[in-house]
Amino acid sequence: MKPHTVSLVLSNLASLAAATCKCTPGHACWPSLEEWSRFNSSIGGQLIQSSPVAEACYSGPKDNAACQNIEKSWTDDVFQVSQPIGYAWPLNLSCPLPTPGLDTKCSIGNSPVYVVNVTCEEDITRGIKFAQEKNLRLVVKSTGHDSQQRSTGYGSLSIWLHNFRKGFRFQGHNPVLATCPKSGWKGSTLTINGGYSWRDIYPAAQKQGLIVIGGLDRGPCSTGGWTQGGGHSPGTHYFGIGADQVLSARVVLASGKIVVASPCENEDLFFAIRGGGGGTFGVVTEITVKTYPTKALSTINLIVGSKGDETVPKFLDAVATIYSLLPGLSKKGFAGYGNWVVRALSPITAKNYTNLYGQSWTLLGATQQEAENLFQPFKEEIVKHQSENGLEVTVSSGTFRDYFSYYYSMGNGTDSAVGGVSALASRLLDTEALQGNRKDLRKFLDSITQGSAVYHTLIHHGLEAAADVKADPTSAVLPGWYKSILLDEFEIPMNTTDVDAYAGSFEYLRNELVPLYESLSPDTGTYMNEADWGNMNWKKDFFGSHWDRLLKVKTRYDPEGFFYCPKCVGSDDWVENKGGSLCRA
């Protein structure tokens, strides 16, 4: 082959690579400093060159005073959210806090290289245009509360919505009805324009005497991935999943066009952004959601505890009974959150339990006496497990004047610690799984407690048995939510964000525990926002029967697949090279 022919072939190959892979630092196609500067000027100086959150703690840029503040604030949710590349639950963190005795290093890793600090919709459209012109990977981040790592991306440009705040307003009517009679909702509403966390919304809602369906954790963004991915809350049993509250939305598309999505405009997009996942179909800048008059509520609180391995069989007998009672409790109107563990890594509570089940149920609109009376038959079944050899059962009750008084009593008036991660998976369990065969359920509990200590978080939403809440056909919420009683999240704690160091824990979850859960409840799936990032059946488990329809919406509104995130609709058109660029599959 002649030299000029070889050069031509190599040139064509380089062009082909540029066309099929996103540009990353070090490649000839990466924008020059001058180009970045011009882009920064076009968005009013809102471009941030990223630096790792803990960078000040490392030699070179080390700043002892700044480092002390970072160390003190590291697990503070508000602190991490306020950082352009701060994340609540980071995996493979490339710049952890230095640990004495360990050779920790600091780099930007898979975090975005530049960040658009969005303050208006025009910043978003200009960021999209620049990323498309320069063939850059774009990621969308509101608060970074994401176990799936969807708001990170090697060599990317980030659209950061934390400081985009144009206000929120409560209304005694549904403004969507003025242009869209099909909206249907005739109650009060809340319009949120910007990247407000639920912590911003809840105090105002309480003052208005209203219930807003938002996260149990008040840290996530109200217009972001929590809502777009589904969203469970203390009010889910009574009012439905978070995504189903949305009446309309403003969305910035990959084309740069800003559209309204409602039952009357862009109906297919309206369907997709309500449960089809965030960061996928466009950038949502505003939503209008349903609100509800607040009510008094009562609670039933349960603790079952024991010490030592010898009590584990009787403890699991009690857990099996509680699980089997959940569908019946749902029919009576009870719902709530719980936790349990067998052989805890360290003793729990002042009684030093090693095996503990704790649950708090709510009954909206009921007095304390009414709640106690309705719970009595269930209490009698649970108390039967109390024994002289150390299995203790405690049941108490309470009452609250309104929804948010209860919410704040749960400790949610303060922000939960962030920064730590775990090997996590989850499954929605239906009535058949919980009540179909008691012996099979008990064997299942034995099987999932044979290995390392696994900590369970229970979201007893009870939608399968909810009398007044049904699946919305105009919503992409996973159908399994409305065909199940319980979301069981199971996790193994990690002392580092290094996934490779805990490869055995992830293998145990994926190869041992997850198949057992799938066998118990095969057709329900799980909640995409609180699931294993390595789930191999993610299309079925995260989207269920909606997958094909969502893929059509993706193709219509983002035909080039510009918006990419892992395990999202359309993501299998791309491949993430380890430590490198994003390329066409």
From Swiss-Prot:
Cross-referenced Pfam families, in alphabetical order? BBE, FAD_binding_4
Signal peptide per UniProt: 1-19
GO MF, one term, reads: oxidoreductase activity
UniProt cofactor(s): FAD
Checking Gene3D superfamilies in the record gives: 3.30.465.10
Q: Which residues carry this modification: Pros-8alpha-FAD histidine?
A: 145
Stored InterPro entries: BBE, FAD-bd_PCMH, FAD-bd_PCMH-like_sf, FAD-bd_PCMH_sub2, FAD-linked_Oxidoreductases_BP, Oxid_FAD_bind_N, Oxy_OxRdtase_FAD_BS
Glycosylation-annotated residues: 40, 92, 117, 352, 412, 495
Q: What induces it?
A: Expression is positively regulated by the apicidin F cluster-specific transcription factor apf2 that binds to the eight-base-pair motif 5'-TGACGTGA-3' called the 'Api-box' that is found in all promoters of the apicidin F cluster except in the promoter region of apf2 itself.
According to the entry, every stretch annotated as the FAD-binding PCMH-type domain falls at 108-294
Industrial and biotechnological uses noted in the record? Apicidin F, like the other known apicidins, is a cyclic tetrapeptides with anti-malarial properties via histone deacetylase inhibitory activity.
Q: Which UniProt keywords apply?
A: FAD, Flavoprotein, Glycoprotein, Oxidoreductase, Signal
Q: What is this protein called?
A: FAD-linked oxidoreductase apf9
Which pathway does the record list?
Secondary metabolite biosynthesis
Q: What residue ranges carry the coiled-coil annotation?
A: none
Q: What is the lineage of its organism?
A: Eukaryota, Fungi, Dikarya, Ascomycota, Pezizomycotina
What EC number(s) are associated with this protein in UniProt? 1.-.-.-
The job of this chain, per UniProt, is described as: FAD-linked oxidoreductase; part of the gene cluster that mediates the biosynthesis of the cyclic tetrapeptide apicidin F (APF). The non-ribosomal peptide synthetase apf1 incorporates four different amino acids to produce apicidin F: L-phenylalanine, D-pipecolic acid (D-pip), N-methoxy-L-tryptophan and L-2-aminooctanedioic acid. L-Phenylalanine is the only proteinogenic amino acid directly used by apf1. The 3 other apf1 substrates are non-proteinogenic and have to be modified by other enzymes of the cluster.
Q: What is reported when this gene is inactivated?
A: Leads to the loss of apicidin F production but accumulates apicidin K.
